[in-house]
Amino acid sequence: YDSQSEITKYNNETNLLGDKIYRKGMKMGEIWGYVTDRFYTEDDFNADGTLKPGIPIPKGAGKVFPGDVLYKNFDDDTETIWSGEGTADNPGDQRIIGNSTPRFHYGITAGISWKGLDLSIFLRGVGKRDYWRTDQIAWPTGGWGSLFKETLNFWTPTNTNAYYPRVYSNDGVNTSYN
């Protein structure tokens, strides 16, 4: 059976979004965020390094470079990626990108007995759950750490079809977005 819960009544007239903020019509465990479109490419920039018209930049992100993540722009503002008013009525460019509620729980139990020896096993799991990774699994290179082999497929000028965005020093640039 599908484990989902929806809030049918809650006093939040402003429809604010956020962690532990509830609203009518919300499915428990909603994950709001930006939807990846692609990486910025060198073609998105003018010769002086500024973005060409119509290429959006995340609000407050500072300067972006080729290889940074470009998010989809869903609202009428074509120059900025932003969180709107932070409400369900005006989420800006954020969308529901997942749900952290474990769904489709299952379990299997088996046992066998032979000449006084008993063996039993119990397996259980979840068939669907989205996970918002914000720890060392997501950011394994914190501090002076080294890269895992799996993370070496990052964007460079010679590897523009990479899986991961460009790497850069931990100087606080784009930390809210990339």
What is the role of each PLM region?
Residues G116-S120:
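Repeated loop/turn-to-beta-strand initiation elements of outer-membrane beta-barrel proteins
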Residues Y106, L147-F148:
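Domain-core and long-helix interface of multi-subunit machines
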